[in-house]
Amino acid sequence: MRILIIEDEQKLGDYLVKGLTESGFVVDLARTGPEGRNLALDGDYDLVVLDVMLPGIDGFAVLETVRKSKAMPVLMLTARDDVADRVRGLQSGADDYLAKPFAFSELLARIQALLRRGRKLHEVSSYTLP
């Protein structure tokens, strides 16, 4: 499974790469909005972990652009935890929203749940009647 992390905070980005790699995922990291948008559009990812506050363009703009052509799950991971931001993220197409600070175990559980749901939807949509 391949995950794209779009996170500008160096320590957190490196921590996520290390933890998710150790959990068996192939992980790419983008540190700006434009870089993340381009990787998400051009790459073949099973899931995106997306920060809101990014240099260049914010995570909401990245999400809206990616949603126009890609259907992979997106988990927004951000320090912006007010209700309006969570609602905006979910209405813009995010599949889940997790506020910083967070426990890595919760992030991993949410990623696994999103990937499970994604696989089930893919299996249903690719099923053909005999």
Regions found by a protein language model. Give the residues of each.
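N-terminal/domain-start alpha-helical segments
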Residues: M1-K120
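CheY-like receiver
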Residues: G118-P130
